Amino acid sequence: SHHKPKLQINITTGKWHCWVSNQGGHNLFQLFKKVGASNEHFSELGGLVDDIPKYKRNTDTSKEVVQLPKEYKPLWNGGDSIVKRHALSYLYKRGITDDDILRYDIGYCDDGLYSNRIIIPSYDSDGKLNFFVGRDFYNGKMKYRNSPTSKDIVGFDLFINWDEPIILCEGVFDAMAFKRNAIPLFGKTVMKTLQKKIIESRVKIIYLALDNDAIVDATKISEYFINNGIKVKMMKF
């Protein structure tokens, strides 16, 4: 019947399905990415999702399951506390905007194992959680306490356009600062899953943005991809 909806969206769970293309997904950001939404549209989404719980759990039992800490609270949504204010202050000082907070689903914990940490999730191309970073915002002895799961993933895959040049950088804050097509390595080496994705996606140009103390690592990465027919450009800071 012509009354059947062409696009169905559950704003409570974020799940969507297009009856024309028979495609579906787990969250609204994935849908926005598919239709080529601009940054302005992502900002507008911010005004709509105030009370929508975001996708937080990967229920795929065939792989290692990544879960956000149970104490995780989104920074873009409701509530106020001194800890939340300090978390936001830390992010603003590092150049992270409200749009970034919404786009990357950034949250925080004020209790538990990840207490006083900003939580930055990473989602795969299907919108499933594949890793998260926990950064202490009171500058305690242990700066980072990350997901206990493997780093052998593609960081921020949900936001990557593989038809364009990509940027490889060390951390999530670097990746967010670049604003466009940047993949955090969660370190100084390119893991197998990311290597494979880059080769299979036929990426033509890689911009390598490692810290100055990582010359040896950068050279190894560069040689590997050049040997695979990919142009590599070093970025200096």
Task: Outline where the language-model segments fall.
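TOPRIM metal-binding catalytic domain and adjacent DNA-binding surface shared by DnaG-type primases
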Residues: 1-4, 33-119, 123-126, 160-161, ...
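Short Cys/His-based metal-binding microdomains
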Residues: 5-43
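A residue-level signal for conserved active-site and pocket-lining positions in enzyme catalytic cores
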Residues: 18, 91, 127, 208
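A generic structural motif
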Residues: 46, 231-237
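Phosphate-handling DNA/RNA-contact segment within nucleic-acid enzymes
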Residues: 104, 110-205
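Acidic beta-strand-to-loop metal/phosphate-binding motif
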Residues: 168, 204-213, 217
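Short, acidic/turn-prone active-site loops that include or flank metal/cofactor-
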Residues: 186-192, 210-213, 237
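Short, aromatic/basic amphipathic alpha-helical patches
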Residues: 217-229
